[in-house]
DNA sequence: ATTATTTGACCTAG
DNA sequence: CTAGGTCAAATAAT
């Protein structure tokens, strides 16, 4: 049996794959002129495979979803949902495609990209759903645990002020989701150092980590050190309107570069599958503020 | 029932 | 050996 948590988690993976695909497209696009045919082929292969995988995965998810909710009206709508999501996620990319492939007012380019994949949903490809979904089964119990190497790329240190508002001043909140995995007393520091890693480390090897250390002299300030940039595309939405920086950078030293996407994939999954209980609310098709 | 945090053990570079 | 970083089992939170 599948829980809904599981499914929306799977949805996250699908969205991540799509993001990755789009990234590949962009990178190909920017280096298109000076690309030798061989490497062009390689790039295209990779892109096709990425989207194809996402397509397969999405098909399975929809099969599951449809079989679990006796209702059946999702299919025609999915395309527009995908479009809507893409517009939210990558307006820039959409625009590019409109210009290039002569779309009209609606998002033709991207629509075309996805139509092929999503139409296939109707084709009722009977697949072994269970096999692919519950893959993470038993493995060799004694893996000689690989140890971390030294120096994992860039490093960025930021000083942030603790929140003055009332209570515990501990969690400075950037726009990523972190999972604490350790805490250590540091020699010569009055306060412990906390270790976090990206929550979506599982969504294939997102290496992002951070350390949070309260300053000795100024307990109202934290030193946050970031290591590795996110390869997951699941930043929590920094909505343009809600510019409430709960975290105030005082100063920063940067040696790296990171990409931020506008909307969390997690939220995408919620749009499509809802975050609530099982089999409820088929209105997930429309935006939250839909009048109806 | 799943996901997150806590915390001592464990690991590795120096 | 020590110090800092990470793992993972127990525990808490949702």
UniProtKB/Swiss-Prot annotation:
Key words of the record: DNA-binding, Nucleus, Transcription, Transcription regulation
Q: Which GO terms describe its cellular component?
A: nucleus
Name of the gene this protein is made from: WRKY55
InterPro entries registered for this protein in UniProt: WRKY_dom (IPR003657), WRKY_dom_sf (IPR036576), WRKY_plant (IPR044810)
DNA-binding region, as residue ranges, is located at: 167-235
Please indicate which superkingdom the organism of origin belongs to. Eukaryota
Protein family = Belongs to the WRKY group III family.
**Species this chain originates from:** Arabidopsis thaliana (Mouse-ear cress)
Q: Extract the GO molecular function terms from the UniProt entry.
A: DNA-binding transcription factor activity; sequence-specific DNA binding; transcription cis-regulatory region binding
Biological process (GO) annotations? regulation of gene expression
Give the region (Disordered) as residue ranges. 133-155
* Protein name as catalogued: WRKY transcription factor 55
* Biological function: Transcription factor. Interacts specifically with the W box (5'-(T)TGAC[CT]-3'), a frequently occurring elicitor-responsive cis-acting element.
Name the predominant localization.
nucleus
- Output the Pfam families linked to this UniProt entry: WRKY
Against PANTHER family, the record matches this protein to: WRKY TRANSCRIPTION FACTOR 21-RELATED (PTHR31282)
Subcellular localization, as worded in the UniProt entry: Nucleus
Asked if the Swiss-Prot or TrEMBL record annotates the protein with the keyword Nucleotide-binding, the reply is no
């Amino acid at each position: 049996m599948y829980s809904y948590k599981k499914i929306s988690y799977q949805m996250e993976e699908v969205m991540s794959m799509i993001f990755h695909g789009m990234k590949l497209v962009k990178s190909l696009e920017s280096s298109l002129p000076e690309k030798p045919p061989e490497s062009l082929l390689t790039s295209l292969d990779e892109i096709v495979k990425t989207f194809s995988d996402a397509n397969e995965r999405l098909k399975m998810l929809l099969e599951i979803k449809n079989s679990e909710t006796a209702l059946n009206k999702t299919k025609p709508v999915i395309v527009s949902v995908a479009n809507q999501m893409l517009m939210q996620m990558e307006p820039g990319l959409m625009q590019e495609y409109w210009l290039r492939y002569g779309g009209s007012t609606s998002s033709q380019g991207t629509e075309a990209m996805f139509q092929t994949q999503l139409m296939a949903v109707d084709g009722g490809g009977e697949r072994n759903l269970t096999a692919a979904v519950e893959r993470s089964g038993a493995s060799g119990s004694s893996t000689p645990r690989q140890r971390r190497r030294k120096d994992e790329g860039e490093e960025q240190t930021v000083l942030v002020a603790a929140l003055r508002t009332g209570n515990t001043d501990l969690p400075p909140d950037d726009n990523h989701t972190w999972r604490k995995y350790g805490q250590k007393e540091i020699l010569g520091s009055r306060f412990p150092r906390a270790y976090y890693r990206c929550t979506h480390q599982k969504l294939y090897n997102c290496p992002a980590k951070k350390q949070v250390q309260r300053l000795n002299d100024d307990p109202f300030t934290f030193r946050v050190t970031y290591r590795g940039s996110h390869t997951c595309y699941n930043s929590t939405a920094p909505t343009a309107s809600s510019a409430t920086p709960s975290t105030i950078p005082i100063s920063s030293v940067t040696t790296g570069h990171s990409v931020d996407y506008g909307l969390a994939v997690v939220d995408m999954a919620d749009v499509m599958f809802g975050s609530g209980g099982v089999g409820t609310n088929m209105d997930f098709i429309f935006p939250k503020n839909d009048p109806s």
